[in-house]
Amino acid sequence: MSYNLKKELLKALGAVKRTLKEYKYYIKDTENEKAKLKKMEEEKKDESDITRQKYSVEETEGAKVQTYKTLVKFIAPLKEIVEKIESEDSNDEEFLKQQAEVKDMKEFIEAKEHIKETDEIISQEGATNA
C-alpha cells in the first residue's frame, strides 16, 4: 500500500493555517467596524453614512461567518490525518516508517496546536450562538 503522510499533513495544515489567519483577521475587522459605527452614532453623523457603516459591519460579519464555516470544514481532514499518524494500529512497514518521520516534523506539532486552537474557537462560537 502506498502512503504519503507528509503530503497529506502539509496539504491539510496549509488549508487550516490560511483559513485560521483569515478568520482572525475578520474577528479584528468586525470589532473595528463595530467601533467605528458606534462612534459615528455617538457623534450623530449623517444617517446615510451610518447606514453605509451598518452595511459594512454586516458584510464583515458575513465574511467572518463564512470563514468560520470553511475553518470547520477544513479542520476535519487535519484531525483525521493527525489521528492516522498517532495511531498504532498498523503493521505495514512503509506506513510505520513514514509515521515515525512525520511525527518528528515541526509541522506535525503545529498541526496539533492548530487543532487545539480551532477546537477552542468552535467551542466559543458554539457558546456564543447557543
Give residue ranges: language-model regions.
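Amphipathic alpha-helical coiled-coil segments
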Residues: 56-78
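A structural signal for well-ordered alpha-helices, especially hydrophobic packing surfaces
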Residues: 20-23, 61-64, 68, 82, ...
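Short E/K-rich amphipathic alpha-helical oligomerization segments
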Residues: 31-54, 76-86
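Long C-terminal interaction segments enriched in charged/acidic composition
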Residues: 91-130
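Coiled-coil termination/hinge junctions
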Residues: 72-98
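Non-transmembrane amphipathic alpha-helical segments
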Residues: 12, 16-19, 23-40, 60, ...
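Short, charge-rich amphipathic alpha-helices with coiled-coil/heptad character
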Residues: 1-15
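Short, charged, amphipathic alpha-helical segments
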Residues: 49-58, 96-99
